[in-house]
Amino acid sequence: MKRNLLFAAVALVALVSCKETKSPFKRYVDNYAVVNIEAPDLSGITDNGKEVLNLYRFAADEVDAIYWEQYFGDKQSLLDGIEDPMQKTFAEINYGPWDRTTGKSFVQGYKDCPPGAGFYPADMTAEEFAAWNNPDKNSPYTLVRRTADGSLETVWYHDAYSSHIEKIGNYLKAAADITIKPSVAKYLLSKADALKTDNYYESALAWLDMDDSKMDLVIGPNEAADDQLLGIKRSYEAFVLLKNQAHTDELMQYVSRIAEFQEDLPGEPAYKTFQPGAGSNIFSCDALYYAGKANAGIKVIALNLPFDADVQRERGTRTILLENVIKAKYNHIVGPGGEVLLEPEYAAHLSPDAFFWNTAFREVAHGLGVKETIDGKGSVEKALGSAAVTMEEVKANTAGVLLVCKLQDHYDIHHIFTKEDALATFFASLVSSERFGEGSSLGRANIIIYNYLAQAGAFPRKASNQYALDFQKMESALSDLTALVLKTQATGDKAFADQFESQYSKLSSNYDSDRRSLSLENIPADIRFSFQH
């Protein structure tokens, strides 16, 4: 009898477990491998410094709340209305009811994501926006809303999110009061003012000047990738970072060669005229915390900021490599994914060092090329509109790996890995990242590059269903594509950019096969974080 009861209990547990794991959203959640961001080694940080880090995280949490409102709306209402725990987790990963890889709704009662996300009225068209006469509409820091009579109006970010911004300002001022670094205090106070006025010029300069701190805080509305209607409005995000000084010193030797890297890019000299200021730097950091746009969907592994072309021209940019996140992406996705996708001869060239350097120079490439069109159409961002972000991602990815190949030609980093390692690792990352989908500018950029290289015969598919690589054709095609994008940006040719993106951003016939191969080996599409409190 006891034995029968035991079997019944086991059967009941099995039944309950089966029901718990039957959510159709489990496979979507499992596509994001959990990465634990451990508590950092703070042995070299003073007690004041540790408290500054805590205040940075509190400020980042307020940014997270802003981003939910900005991109979607009422977070709690959405989550409270979802009963399936896996579906709720997927909504938390995506910061809303829309799968970021497709833009499609996965929650009943919500339509697909509008191209302008929460920045504009869902029913506003690009034509209506263009015809609307408003001096603030093109600011990256205004929302567009409908009034009671159906007309459009702008609302400044600092007004729309004033209660959160006041709290952020208080945290930043408190951190400024206790830091022992004058450069840090200056930056934090400047950023607090900038968030209250949506004027970020002075705070961007102060941030670039803050190069003597072991800690960094990137905070504010930075990137416009969420605005797929017009490519104007920027999303709030925050990164709390701890600098790896040894790796930073190693990377900084390349900063003085920015002009040389500009010359190394393919194409006409007129299409690569931008000269960033002499204050550029490269930091290698461990990420301690992501919030807002940074933590939504696909996780970035490096930054190149600020985006303000005037600041870039006057002072330069800061490239930040998120070292622990780069390692996590390689170990979970790029390395094992490459072993699945590439024939053994080419998989032997996969290299975590190559992935790190490819990432570094992708971010350096963001600061190269042109920022203003050469024929009077204004900034590249303005001239290319909704195509600007995707074209910029294509340029950075292709130009970055080309610059790494140039360094190999010069024997700068030949002792660490080979040119073939750089190209094979780039390809493995490219195919794995196609799964970011057509719903994001980064996903579309990867699809465009894949299709362009395929057209050039750079990676024949073998009977094994794995890829072989023609390194010479790959490097040549990457050069041609980089030159084409630089020309498109310099001439502000929106018609061509739209046509080119439409032609090349369709998933290839190989995509389903590659996705299946990666899925069968449980290779995730991306990662999500579990932060140590």
Where are these regions (language model features)?
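Post-HEXXH active-site segment of zinc metalloproteases
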Residues: 370-394
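Active-site recognition of the HExxH zinc-binding catalytic motif
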Residues: 46, 354-371, 396, 401
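Contiguous, non-catalytic segments that form substrate-binding/exosite surfaces or channel walls
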Residues: 157-347, 351
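Long, well-structured alpha-helical subdomains associated
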Residues: 401-499
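C-terminal motif of bacterial Sec signal peptides marking the signal peptidase cleavage site
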Residues: 14-17
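Extended, compositionally biased alpha-helical segments that mediate assembly or anchoring
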Residues: 485-533
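N-terminal helix-rich structural modules
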Residues: 22-188
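An active-site-proximal "capping" alpha-helix that borders the catalytic cofactor pocket
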Residues: 181, 389-407
